[in-house]
C-alpha cells in the first residue's frame, strides 16, 4: 500500500494547493493521504470530497506546534482522524496562528528596513492564501533559489537562525495539552518525527496523556530512528505511522507517498 500520513498544503507552509497535492497523489498511486497542516484543520472537508473524486482516501489531520517546557525542546504532535473545525484544537491552536502571523509580519518589516529586495505584496498574497504568514512565504518573496540549493539554505540561516535579523521565535503550547486536545476531538495523537526534534524522552509522559502513535517513517529519520520507534511502539502499544512531510517547493521532499513496509 502506498500512503502518506504527513502532508502540508498552502493552508499552512506548503506551496501546493489541496487539489495539486491530491492530483499528484492520484498519479503516483497513493491510496491514503493525511493533510497535517500546522495548527489548523481548515479545508479538510473540501479536500476529502476532492480525494473521493480522484480515488484518494483523505484522512483529516493537523500538526500541532508544541513545546516540552521541562527539557526546552520543540515537539510536534500529529492529530490523525480529526474533522475540520475540531473545536478543542481550534481553541488551543488559534493563538499560535495569531502569534506566528504577528511574528512573520515583524520579520517582514526587518527585511524591508535592512534593505533586502523582498516582494512584500507576494509575501502577503501567499499569507492570505494560508491561515497565516510563514517564513517560507517571506523566503519565496525574497529569492527564486529552490529550497534544496546551498544559496537558499545559506540565506535562510543567515536571516532566520544564528542571531540573524529575523531570528525570533514564538511561544508554543504544551505538548501534553496538544495530545489531550487531539484525543478530546476524537483523533489519534502521534508523536511526529521524534528523531528530528529529539523528543523521545517525552514519550512516556505523552502516553499518559493519551498518545496513541509514533511517526516511525520520516525523511529525517535514520535506520536507528526506525528501530527505536519500532521498539517504543511495542513497549507502549503505539501505532507506527509514516509520511513524507511534503511541503512542495518549500521543502526538500520531491513528491508525496511512500510504500508501507510489509
From Swiss-Prot:
Enzyme class: hydrolase
Pfam families reported for this sequence: PHP
Entry annotated with the keyword Manganese: yes
UniProtKB keywords: Hydrolase, Manganese, Metal-binding
UniProt EC number: 3.1.4.57
GO molecular function term, any single one: metal ion binding
InterPro entries: Cycl_ph_dihydrol, PHP_dom, PHP_domain, Pol/His_phosphatase_N, Pol/histidinol_Pase-like
PANTHER family (UniProt xref): EXONUCLEASE, POLYMERASE_HISTIDINOL PHOSPHATASE N-TERMINAL DOMAIN-CONTAINING PROTEIN
Record-given protein name: Phosphoribosyl 1,2-cyclic phosphate 1,2-diphosphodiesterase
Species assigned in the record: Eggerthella lenta (strain ATCC 25559 / DSM 2243 / CCUG 17323 / JCM 9979 / KCTC 3265 / NCTC 11813 / VPI 0255 / 1899 B) (Eubacterium lentum)
Source organism phylogeny: Bacteria, Bacillati, Actinomycetota, Coriobacteriia, Eggerthellales
